[in-house]
Amino acid sequence: MTNIRKTHPLLKIVNHSLIDLPAPSNISAWWNFGSLLGLCLMIQILTGLFLAMHYTSDTATAFSSVTHICRDVNYGWLIRYLHANGASMFFICLYMHVGRGIYYGSYTYLETWNIGIVLLFAVMATAFMGYVLPWGQMSFWGATVITNFLSAIPYIGTTLVEWIWGGFSVDKATLTRFFAFHFILPFIIAALVMIHLLFLHETGSNNPSGIPSDSDKIPFHPYYTIKDVLGFLMLILLPLLLLLFSPDFLGDPDNYTPANPLNTPPHIKPEWYFLFAYAILRSIPNKLGGVLALVMSILILAIIPFLHMSKQRSMMFRPISQVLFWILVADLLTLTWIGGQPVEHPFITIGQVASILYFSIILILMPLASLIENKILKW
């Protein structure tokens, strides 16, 4: 008798995706981040659901409802900090996942890569709207500043901003709609993840060497299920250490002050995972130019496949490209640091240099390095 997992219409899909899936035999720990992101999404949806049971999306009670969750709800503090620090882990995994895609040339799977970019934008939108919900000072002013960027769009900008706000300023209508969107978006993300996987399984997974591995496949279960479980344990350990010892380490103290439209915080800044894009935005004095640079800092990922000049797919055997890649990583860390600093000398100049370097590495230096490497190898 054939095993039910191979005949049942529903279990068959699970079987082909997680059990009998032929996987390359040499994929490293960098390939763990896909499953870790799935775990992060599940944790966020579950903790978010329990938070939504106690949260009220009204300007008068939002801040106190979060306080109530932390003080009066059974393990409410744990759920709240799991959700907040879970978002940080989500973005760490996301950036690692994208970085791995760039390093090993996974972007040549165009459909998978493009759905991934849509996913990145969706997660960023969700995180931004979630940050507004506790209705602290940084929530309110973050929402005001970020939504105001849309006013840079010529002709329709101001109308668009007021339409998003639901009034002439960030207020009750804004908070209510942000809560609604913050609740629905993770389910849209889950659907996009299914499409992402569907496209990935059309081509099969890439591997560190970048060479087709059709002749050398192993079943996903037990080899990579065990490997993923090890990743899960490590991923759960990190945020647990963080949230049990210093849960507010990655947060902003200003968000423990209730939102006050009459009092602007000295430094308005987003969560740490948006600081690199925020630094790029601030490095351009013109408002529209800054907003375009902000969008392009992420959208540039869509151009990367068309800038691939190398005859090799992966960077594993390309030392010049490797050096450039790690300079890019260091540059992004520099931008993250600059985004959290006040707008004054020397931070302005460092931010501008780092922003120019970011775009020039991706658009000019990496394709050039690829051509030089081809020449060296006489290809």
Curated annotation (Swiss-Prot):
Mode of membrane association: Multi-pass membrane protein
Location within or outside the cell: Mitochondrion inner membrane
Known cofactor(s): heme b
Residues annotated to bind a ubiquinone: H201
Entry keyword set: Electron transport, Heme, Iron, Membrane, Metal-binding, Mitochondrion, Mitochondrion inner membrane, Respiratory chain, Transmembrane, Transmembrane helix, Transport, Ubiquinone
Name of one Pfam family that matches: Cytochrom_B_C
Domain of life: Eukaryota
Gene Ontology, cellular component aspect: mitochondrial inner membrane; respiratory chain complex III
SS bond partners: none
Cofactor binding note of this UniProt entry: Binds 2 heme b groups non-covalently.
InterPro entries assigned to the protein according to its UniProt record, in alphabetical order: Cyt_b/b6_C, Cyt_b/b6_C_sf, Cyt_b/b6_N, Cytb/b6-like_sf, Cytochrome_b, Cytochrome_b_C_euk/bac, Cytochrome_b_N_euk/bac, Di-haem_cyt_TM
Binding site for heme b b566: H97, H196
MF (Gene Ontology): metal ion binding; ubiquinol-cytochrome-c reductase activity
GO biological process, one term: mitochondrial electron transport, ubiquinol to cytochrome c
Note: Heme 1 (or BL or b562) is low-potential and absorbs at about 562 nm, and heme 2 (or BH or b566) is high-potential and absorbs at about 566 nm.
Record function comment: Component of the ubiquinol-cytochrome c reductase complex (complex III or cytochrome b-c1 complex) that is part of the mitochondrial respiratory chain. The b-c1 complex mediates electron transfer from ubiquinol to cytochrome c. Contributes to the generation of a proton gradient across the mitochondrial membrane that is then used for ATP synthesis.
Similarity remark: Belongs to the cytochrome b family.
Protein name: Cytochrome b
Recorded name of the encoding gene: MT-CYB
